[in-house]
Regions:
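Substrate-binding and catalytic surfaces of secreted/luminal carbohydrate-active proteins
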Residues: 269-272, 288-291, 299-461
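N-terminal module-boundary/linker segments of secreted carbohydrate-active enzymes
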Residues: 40-148, 268-269, 278
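Chitinase-like catalytic core of GlcNAc-active glycosidases
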Residues: 111-327
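Bacterial Sec-dependent N-terminal signal peptides
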Residues: 2-16, 20
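Bacterial signal peptide processing site
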Residues: 33-35
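C-terminal motif of bacterial Sec signal peptides marking the signal peptidase cleavage site
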Residues: 28-31
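Ser/Thr/Pro-rich, acidic low-complexity intrinsically disordered regulatory segments
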Residues: 50-102, 234, 391-441, 458
């Protein structure tokens, strides 16, 4: 996605450092870091045979030989098989997607909540593409998301030109989403040239055999079905070079690739990001237009991808007079699509709920919205916090509102002041039967106990 800033990435033991401009998608989380370890701590680490190296600049303890969540370049994915995956057993989600209460049985708690408006959260759930444990670590400091009731789909954000472009969600995140009735999908990320992108990666990805099959598409399907997650988000932003340019043929192949995936595995979701157009150009539309609609519907009106995540500039003053969310809704209806298959993107990675948003452009004026809503990097609540208490308070304001109560009417100083996601998204629940059982844990803690004894921090979503 087109980004304004660069954030520093964490690096992990024995993993290549990502190229500095991998900004764009998996910028590292650098909050809540502790002080330098004491001598006593160093002795404990030595006794436990943990290794801390210069590469691990956050001093995060990484256990030797721990299983690792997967990530690949296209050519590596083609070589992957479940039978030869050493960490297969650890990377499989074991929780089926829970059924949610039917939206028609939900009751709005304010006059602007809409049962049809959906929310897609694109979130950095782990701090980097590589080095992620599938199920927890001995640390309490982590992005423990707790507002699943406002999310309809979670994109597990990852990928970098220095580590891998194809990133399935870690199974702990998939399990947590599924418990709450939220589909979780992985990321396919082709970075811009300035961030290390190579057109050869896209060519390998889109290669079609003479029999009409797409080998990488088959592997994406196999990975999702084997690991137990729900689909893929495709972000293609590699521009190519004068010698090897991006072309209309790439756009056509991408459409065919997505249609092939949906034909082979209709149950898997495919989301396309508003980037490459039908002309084979990087031209962010910030709306559903004639230039990018081919990735939602072909010329005969047949469906392609399930949804589209629009770029973020529709809310900027220079484009405000075009009323792009409204125009997108009209274009969707013209194509025979639901306008709620289109997600107006909001980039809050840098400033969170301090980000100015033209909500008046998003609202339809009928206690509804023109499109659905896409939130890029709601993990800001975690990365900007100095401690877990601040994290939870920021997350509450971000997802609910400044009064921490979705039923409260709030008078805003301007149309651009943060409204809170609960302003538009109705609360959804996966609790459809009794008994209801919970341990009241968010998934992290300062103590882990076994036989009533324990002194180790833990994170286990």
């Amino acid at each position: 996605m087109k980004r304004r800033g660069i954030m520093k990435r964490k690096q992990h033991l024995y993993k290549p450092a990502a190229i500095g401009m991998t900004i764009l998608m998996t910028a590292g989380l650098c909050s809540c870091q502790g002080t330098s370890p004491s001598k006593e701590t160093e002795k404990t680490e030595e006794k436990s045979k943990y290794q801390i190296t210069e590469e691990n600049e956050a001093k995060e303890l990484v256990m030797n030989h721990q299983p690792e969540s997967s990530y690949w370049f296209p050519e590596q994915l083609l070589e992957w098989t479940p039978e030869e995956d050493p960490d297969l057993a650890y990377n499989i989600s074991t929780v089926p997607l829970a059924e949610r209460v039917d939206k028609e049985n939900l009751t709005p708690v304010n006059k602007t909540q809409n049962k049809d408006t959906e929310v897609m959260a694109i979130s950095i759930m782990n701090s980097s593409t590589s080095g992620n444990a599938p199920h927890g670590l001995n640390k309490a400091d982590c992005n423990v998301f707790t507002y699943w009731q406002y999310v309809d789909e979670l994109v597990y954000w990852g990928g970098s030109s220095g580590e891998g472009l194809i990133v399935p969600p870690s199974p702990d995140v998939t399990d947590l989403g599924h418990k709450n009735g939220v589909p979780v999908i992985g990321t396919v990320f082709f970075p811009q040239d300035v961030a290390g992108g190579k057109i050869e990666w896209l060519d390998t990805f889109l290669k079609q055999e003479s029999n009409g099959t797409f080998p990488v598409a088959d592997k994406l399907i196999e990975v999702a079905q084997t690991y137990g997650f729900d689909g893929w988000f495709i972000n293609q932003e590699t521009e190519g070079t004068e010698e090897e340019p991006l072309s209309p043929e790439h756009a056509q192949k991408m459409q065919e690739f997505i249609k092939y995936m949906k034909k082979q595995a209709s149950e898997l979701r495919v989301v396309y990001y508003d980037s490459m157009t039908c002309d084979g150009e990087m031209d962010w539309q910030n709306a559903l237009t004639d230039k990018n609609s081919m990735f939602l519907a072909d010329d005969q009106g047949n469906p392609v991808a399930d949804e589209m995540f629009l770029n973020f500039w529709w809310t900027e003053d220079k484009l405000a007079d075009q009323k792009l969310p409204e125009a997108s809704a009209k274009k969707a209806e013209e194509l025979g699509l639901s306008p709620y298959q289109v997600f107006a993107g909001v980039d809050i990675q840098a400033d969170g709920y301090l980000t100015p948003i033209r909500w008046d452009l998003f609202e339809s004026g009928e206690n509804s919205t023109h499109t659905s809503l896409g939130i890029y990097c709601p993990n800001w609540a975690y990365t900007s916090a100095q401690n877990l208490d601040e994290f939870h308070k920021k997350e509450n304001t971000l997802w609910v509102n400044s009064k921490a109560d979705p039923s409260q009417e709030i008078t805003y100083a301007s149309d651009t002041q943060w409204h809170g996601i609960s302003t538009y998204a109705i609360e959804k629940s996966a609790i459809t039967s009794l008994p209801f059982v919970t341990n009241f844990s968010t998934g992290s803690g300062t103590k882990s106990f076994s036989d009533t004894c324990g002194n180790r921090k833990q994170r286990n979503l």
